[in-house]
Amino acid sequence: AEVERQKVKRLAIDTLSSPEGKEALDYLKLKRGFSVNVIDNFGLGYVPSHVNNLYGDPHEFAGRIVLPIHDPYGELVALSSRDWRKNAYSKFFHEQYIKSNYLYALDIAKDHIIKSNQAIIVEGEFDVMKMHSIGIRRAVGMLGSSLSIKQISLLSRYCQEIFLVFDGDEAGRTSMERAMKLNVKYGLKQYYDILIIPVAMPNNLDPDDF
């Protein structure tokens, strides 16, 4: 599975910069506003729509933008994907892995987190990239709908302050409430030496809107 995952990642990266990946690349650059540098740093790619899996069926990532998920040391854990087209049947799809054990882009942000002694957690992968693209490189993503104590414990190795910048919609507010309950339940300041700081976003906006 690991070899296959690496092959798909390599194919996706190579295809994104080819004529076949132009539509996906245009979306990332023009619609999302990401520079080539950000796209390269995060290892984004595109799997051609005609690619099949080992059984001859259409590959699960075919025709999708691929985002690699790494552990804090840069080891590839899983592949996530997004179909950016308006009428997409399934907007997001990812391999099975324990999302609550990882933080998106921690491998990229780790040194900046250590240097500043603080981290910023946002909800979506593209939110993380937007933060990094405007120079806020201590941002990571929570890879799911709720923050876990495992993720906080992971960050406590590198910093003492965590800012939560979640979406301004109802789901984002619910995620914020859950995260703050962890603060009380586990006594994060006392036992993890971590200060959790919530940051309110304007209604129905997320960090990627700025």
Where are these regions (language model features)?
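Short, small-residue-rich loop/turn micro-motifs
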Residues: 32, 80-83, 204
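Phosphate-handling DNA/RNA-contact segment within nucleic-acid enzymes
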Residues: 1, 5, 47-159, 174-176
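Short phosphate-binding/catalytic loops that engage adenosine nucleotides
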Residues: 33-34, 136, 194
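Conserved phosphate-handling catalytic cores of large alpha/beta enzymes
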Residues: 156, 162-210
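Conserved beta-strand edge residues that scaffold enzyme active sites
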Residues: 8, 43, 145-146, 169
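Non-catalytic accessory segments of DNA primases and related replication-initiation nucleases
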Residues: 1-53, 64, 76, 91-92
